[in-house]
Amino acid sequence: MALWGGRFSQAADARFKNFNDSLRFDYRLAEQDITGSVAWSKALVSVGILTQDEQLTIEAALNDLKLAVLENPEQILQSDAEDIHSWVETQLIAKVGDLGKKLHTGRSRNDQVATDLKLWCKQQGEQLLMQLDKTQQQLVSLAREHQHTVLPGYTHLQRAQPVTFSHWCLAYVEMLERDFSRLTDCLKRLDTCPLGSGALAGTAYPMDRTELAHTLGFASATLNSLDSVSDRDHVMELMSTASMSMIHLSRLAEDLIFYNSGESNFIELADAVTSGSSLMPQKKNPDALELIRGKTGRVFGSLSAMLMTLKALPLAYNKDMQEDKEGLFDALDTWSDCLEMAAMSLVGMKINEERTKEAALGGYSNATELADYLVAKGVPFRDSHHIVGEAVVAAIAKGVPLEALTLAEFKAFDVLIEDDVYHHLSLDETLAKRKAQGGVSPVQVEFALTNAEKRLEERDTSGISIRAAR
């Protein structure tokens, strides 16, 4: 049943109907549409459109419909309704007769869909907060387990300075913390209720929109009806947050793919998140991580499409805005799936500590320590940098690490070098010196790890829904 047939003398062309209808994707808003309709029925009592008994009849029918939808949402797709709003109204009328025709009084699909979408974003956003938290918890657990596991640090994919596996884990904990903060901010900004804004000019019925907003769990009502039905900032913000987080997940995936390679041999991923080859029986491929990396572009694409769709749209509602849902659903579904796979990939991962230490000792990654050693002896850093560069060339020519050069060979580069240089070039000393806040020294890693554990432990997730939006 179309909700707008009276103006037209001819039926819509079937091809146009197929092009125009949105039920095939906005059916995912069924639960939110029903929830909004129950709240609207209560508001209609306050302005004398429905009696209390009529409202209770409508609410009971809508609640029955919601239960049926939650049990089998795909049943909706068997209908030829234009959209989820039409489907819900048709089902309600089938249950309660002409009484159901009163429900849409004073309401437009414009404020209705804006409300449905915000309700969906709130629910799905809260679920994503839980998933971010879970991934952080897994990283922190791994960091605690491998607090003293040495790992080569890289710049330009060249070994640069030694770090620890714990320090590496905590780097991604910080990235996901920013994602958590961004998502929290998004959810705060979208926590306003558009219902009661009508098509664009506001409803003609003097209901209390603040009470209506609170009934639906929003912090407040929106302040401008024209903006309310036009606003899709929350869609773009959530997609932007998803895109930023996917960058972090993609970098995590790429690091682990590199560490898992035969050339690095730093880690071995669990069988549960890898697959094999149809031809090469020896292969164990990091497919979960590669898909995280690959799906990142998919999320970026959804954001880009949404930005282009809304650019230069006139106020208020335009049919272009129907394009907000598929990209949003796909972007947040993809982000959710990738968070789950990232957390799973960290479980059961074996770390080859001997190999990571061997790699950390190679590549002359203690060269900076020799430069700092000379600085402590009074040599200007720029001069010490040049001296150490020459020493590295000599060590490479000899085929030995820096610390294998003899004292006489060191003194050929600078007479200030003494026996204590070997202590300064040791791996333990290299790590221990990085004791400024945020550094890789054991003291600072313990400090950062303890703070991360405390932060996650004290995080209040009690008000977060544990059920994802469909």
UniProtKB/Swiss-Prot annotation:
Keyword match Cytoplasm: yes
Family indicated by similarity: In the N-terminal section; belongs to the lyase 1 family. Argininosuccinate lyase subfamily. In the C-terminal section; belongs to the acetyltransferase family. ArgA subfamily.
Pathway assigned to this chain's UniProt record: Amino-acid biosynthesis; L-arginine biosynthesis; N(2)-acetyl-L-ornithine from L-glutamate: step 1/4; Amino-acid biosynthesis; L-arginine biosynthesis; L-arginine from L-ornithine and carbamoyl phosphate: step 3/3
BP-aspect Gene Ontology terms: arginine biosynthetic process via ornithine; L-arginine biosynthetic process
PANTHER family found in the cross-reference section: ARGININOSUCCINATE LYASE (PTHR43814:SF1)
UniProt region (Argininosuccinate lyase), positions on chain: 1-470
Record-linked HAMAP family: Arg_succ_lyase
UniProt-recorded name of the protein: Bifunctional protein ArgHA
UniProt cross-references to Pfam families, sorted A to Z: ASL_C2 (PF14698), Lyase_1 (PF00206)
Keywords on record: Acyltransferase, Amino-acid biosynthesis, Arginine biosynthesis, Cytoplasm, Lyase, Multifunctional enzyme, Transferase
Further facts: In bacteria which possess the bifunctional enzyme ornithine acetyltransferase/N-acetylglutamate synthase (ArgJ), ArgA fulfills an anaplerotic role.
Predominant location: cytoplasm
Subcellular location: Cytoplasm
Keyword Acyltransferase part of the UniProt annotation: yes
One of the record's GO molecular function terms: argininosuccinate lyase activity
Reactions the enzyme catalyzes: 2-(N(omega)-L-arginino)succinate = fumarate + L-arginine; L-glutamate + acetyl-CoA = N-acetyl-L-glutamate + CoA + H(+)
GO cellular component terms, semicolon-separated: cytosol
